[in-house]
Amino acid sequence: VKIKAIKGLDEIREIVKVSMEESKSVIEMFDVFDEKMIKIGIDSRENVHAKGLWHQTFQCWIVNHTISEGGSFLFQLRHKDKDTYPGLLDISCAGHLQAGEVVDDGVRELQEELGITVSIDELTYCGMIAEENFISTEIMDREFNHVFIHESNNNLEDYAFQKDEISGLYFVNMKEFQRLLNGKIDTILIEGIVMDEVLQTVRPDQRKVQGSDFTPNSYEYYQLIFNKIDSLL
């Protein structure tokens, strides 16, 4: 059997590029449920969103108690090419549970999105909350969200974020964020790091944001998180 020798770096790069493109073409499959969270089958990500089928997500809010008085949430800035909520500030880490996965398996998202290794035992479970979001005529998002909190004093530079999914990371003071949600203030100033796509480097960033700059979540969703944080203090 003859094994073809790889001639140089250019050929290696081409092999890696092809491999990455092939991995992107893999169809994601989700377990799907009825409104009572009883499993009814399996379907593709595309069909799940097109048909508005209930599915599960893993969501983790990272809380830093050293950045500002009262603590701060870590938010990710969604990449402009995301199919849902491009360019908006979102949960620290979140992802769909694949077919056959259990909730604890979702902890892999922290490694994939933020480059940190965390065990499920290091997270605090807030609970499950069901939410429906009609994003467009093509996307009806019905999710059973399993929500966790991870307390970490990492700096922004300690995270190796997934640059094809995330454009930046920001700390947002929890008290100010709560006032923004309650309509007591219109804007807040946040600081973080953002990917400069021209220079392909991470640079500091400061921006003034309002409620519409964040992905939408219900009042009940945020109460679930804030109540759990209060119980931990």
Feature names for model-found ranges:
Residues 28-62:
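A positional/architectural concept
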Residues 62-64, 77, 149-151:
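Short, well-ordered beta-strand micro-motif
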Residues 19-21, 47-59, 68-113:
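Conserved Nudix-box catalytic region and its N-terminal flanking loop in Nudix hydrolases
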Residues 2-17, 21-23, 28, 196:
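Alpha-helical and coiled-coil interaction segments, frequently adjacent to or embedded
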